[in-house]
Amino acid sequence: GRVDCPILFPDDPFLSPVHANFFYRDQKLVVRDEGSVNGVFARITGQVDLPLGARFLVGEQMLEVELVATIDEGAVEDGTYYFASPRRGGDLRIVQRLRGGDTGFTYGALGATIRVGREGNDIDFPDDPFISGHHAHLAWDGAHLTLTDLGSKNGTFLRITHERTLVHGDYVFMGQQLLRVEIV
């Protein structure tokens, strides 16, 4: 964190005063988010289950997955239908979270998969130097959501909800700090 911590980053404004805690339990290293504002993110390898509402990082982009609510498009009491843009199909939307807490773009998925990267994907960030051409893939089967890193150079990071067991070589991202786990 920023204040009175064994691992101290006093100049990182994106860290909470006490951001995270690293400790051993049953001879395994664990990281715990201590209620930080911006979260603790762990690099994923391969495919992981992704709960709805989870936040993840690709490059400098913080993205969140939401389930699109079913809306009754029927007429109101007097028989009038609400006129607006037509709805896209799909059950999911990806929401970009901006610094300061604002919402950036929202992408309504048309199908069961979404690819994220720099170019040639469903969602592209051509100006983000930390995103690979084809960086990550989301898949939804109607009941389960998965996130897969596609061998990106800088990794895909999933926000932990409470604690996560770490192994040698794992990466943890918090604030502006990228930490590599070295268990000796």
Which residues are covered by each model-predicted region?
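Forkhead-associated
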Residues: 1-52, 58-59, 107-176
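Short amphipathic alpha-helical linker/capping segments at the junctions of internal repeats
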Residues: 47, 55, 72-76
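Regulatory inter-domain linker segments that are low-complexity and enriched
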Residues: 61-130, 139-143, 177-184
